[in-house]
From Swiss-Prot:
Record InterPro entries: AGPR_type-2 (IPR010136), NAD(P)-bd_dom_sf (IPR036291), NAGSA_dehydrogenase (IPR050085), Semialdehyde_DH_NAD-bd (IPR000534)
Reaction(s) the record says it catalyses: N-acetyl-L-glutamate 5-semialdehyde + phosphate + NADP(+) = N-acetyl-L-glutamyl 5-phosphate + NADPH + H(+)
Protein name per the record: N-acetyl-gamma-glutamyl-phosphate reductase
Stated role: Catalyzes the NADPH-dependent reduction of N-acetyl-5-glutamyl phosphate to yield N-acetyl-L-glutamate 5-semialdehyde.
The organism's place on the tree of life at top rank: Bacteria
Major subcellular site: cytoplasm
């Protein structure tokens, strides 16, 4: 018997991606709401309560409203907004977070999908805090470079029009240092302080890399880049969607340059360490529309339903057929999520 799945907010980036992931599966029955009834609370409630799994791809306020419409105790809600990511009543949707996280995802009927920047940040920081290398009160500064697909249909259209020279260079944003991912970055990494976090949008569709600088002399213990890489490798041993590169591995670079888009079209996160015993950087790379959004949501669903965790997902990018891309179809405002 197929699992019944409903996507509330299927016209946005994450919703469209979810439909792409799920539409070819024979173990999923997609519940389709009529286009003219998508904003009808009564109709939405009917579909939400009929589903085994309901994905919410909505702004925070709308997600909270949708949750209030669900009274079926058997419906698992997987929410892609920022509304519940630090709530004790919701399982954080990062199966690789810590031992026991998959069990929590299997047992929970409320799952909060991590933000794209936060996913990369937490994958870097949680192992280092757990290992006692990075003190909880360490003053973290993080930089994230991301593609423009996170900015929604208008931003995608602006970049595709290519008539604004300002869009050709990287553009920092969220300079008030109040980005909506900060709470989950702090809580899920077990930090005492939120990081100083600067995201930057670049002139490419998708791909994301978060980089954090570390001064070993200010850490709880003196470590080398190789030590940090070993911590990552040990922490994520056996994780099919986490790939840890050897420290200072030049083979991961392109003539000395880092490829932010190297994990695109996968559900993979790649972790790197570069530097010396005096100073180093750690970097996590992922597809902001994959492991940073819809791919993570599907992975959580797979874990919850007890099916193969990799169903619908890719560790390596599939070979694409020839033909034009449709980037505008991948659009909805995600920088806030």
């Amino acid at each position: 018997m197929a699992f019944k799945v409903f996507v509330d907010g299927q016209e946005g980036t994450t919703g469209l991606r979810l439909l792409d992931y799920l539409s070819q599966r024979d173990d999923i029955e997609l519940l389709r709401i009529a286009e003219d009834r998508r904003k009808d609370p009564a109709e939405r409630a009917k579909f939400l309560n009929a589903a085994d799994v309901a994905f919410l791809c909505l702004p925070d306020v709308a997600s909270r409203e949708a949750v209030s419409l669900v009274d079926n105790p058997n419906t698992c809600i997987i929410d892609a907004s920022t509304a519940f990511r630090t709530s004790d009543d919701w399982a954080y949707g990062l199966p690789e977070l810590a031992p026991g996280q998959r069990e929590r995802l299997r047992n929970s009927k409320r799952i909060a999908v991590p933000g794209c920047h936060a996913s990369a940040f937490v994958l870097l920081m949680r192992p280092l805090v757990e290992a006692g290398i990075v003190p909880a009160d360490y003053p973290i500064t993080a930089f994230s470079l991301t593609g423009y697909s996170g900015g929604g249909k208008k931003m995608i259209a602006d970049y595709l029009a290519a008539d604004n020279p300002k869009l050709q260079s990287p553009r920092p944003y969220a300079l008030a240092l109040t980005h909506k991912h900060l709470p989950e970055m702090r809580v899920q990494s077990k930090l005492a302080l939120p990081p100083i976090f600067t995201p930057v949008v670049g002139n490419f569709l998708k791909g994301l890399a978060v980089t954090i600088g570390l001064h070993p002399q200010h850490l709880a213990s003196k470590v080398s880049p190789a030590d940090i890489a070993k911590v990552f490798a040990d922490y994520y041993q056996g994780e099919q969607f986490i790939r840890v590169a050897p420290a200072d591995n030049v083979e991961t670079l392109d003539n000395g340059f880092f490829d932010v888009q190297g994990a695109n079209d996968t559900n993979r996160a790649d972790l790197f360490v570069f530097g010396s015993d005096e100073r180093m950087v750690v970097t996590a790379r992922l597809d902001n529309l994959g492991k940073g959004a819809a791919g993570a949501a599907v992975q959580c669903m797979n874990v919850h339903l007890g099916v193969d965790e990799a169903t619908s997902l890719h560790v390596e990018a599939p070979v694409k057929a020839e033909g034009p891309a449709h980037p505008v179809r991948e659009a909805a405002p995600d920088f806030a999520t």
